[in-house]
Design a protein with these regions (language model features):
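Extended interaction regions within the primary functional domain
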Residues: 21, 28, 72, 104-106, ...
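Generic hydrophobic, helix-prone segments enriched in Leu/Val/Ile
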Residues: 21, 60-64, 113, 128-131
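Context-gated lysine
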Residues: 31, 53-56, 133-136
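Short, low-complexity N-terminal intrinsically disordered segments enriched in polar/charged residues
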Residues: 1-37, 41, 49
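Short low-complexity stretches enriched in small and charged residues
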Residues: 2-6, 52-56, 139-141
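Exposed beta-sheet edge and beta->alpha loop/turn motif
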Residues: 88-142
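Short solvent-exposed beta->alpha transition segments
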Residues: 45-105
């Protein structure tokens, strides 16, 4: 009976951690969409707020300021495709996601987004580290 209770407890615990790890991909996509919306509004300050480590780094801050304001477009922003930085982070990981978005009927914008994912035991957090200038539509991210 004790073994059965332990097995059930273990299964529930692992299931909870897996659910947290899988939901981080959705959180990453939502934050990437927030960046795209800020860029479409031409709100460079919002892009830097969404990437706080970039905002504190002089080179990253300058690079972001150089392109983020040029992406202003009218219309509702939609994600055409998002490839997450990591499918399921079981430890702290830094990776690069690929975001394709457009506003209204405009042409697609494709960007790479550097992401820090925390392991599920420490909360499974997602932090955007930096966003790249637009890349070619068929280009991959490093």
């Amino acid at each position: 009976m004790i073994l059965l209770a332990f097995g059930a407890f273990f299964f529930i615990g692992i299931s909870g951690l897996m659910a947290r790890a899988l939901s981080a991909t959705g959180a990453e996509r939502a934050k990437a969409l927030d960046v795209a919306r800020a860029e479409a509004r031409g709100d460079v300050a919002a892009v830097l707020r969404l990437t706080p480590k970039c905002a504190k780094d002089a080179a990253c801050n300058a690079a972001t300021r150089a392109f983020a304001g040029t992406l202003q477009r009218p219309g509702e922003v939609e994600v055409l495709q998002y490839q997450p930085s990591v499918q399921m982070a079981l430890s702290d990981e830094v990776g690069t996601g690929r975001l394709a978005w457009r506003a209204g009927t405009g042409l697609p914008v494709v960007q790479c987004i550097r992401v820090q994912r925390s392991n599920p035991l420490s909360g499974g957090g997602v932090e955007l580290l930096a966003v790249s200038k637009p890349i070619k539509n068929d280009a991959g991210c490093p």
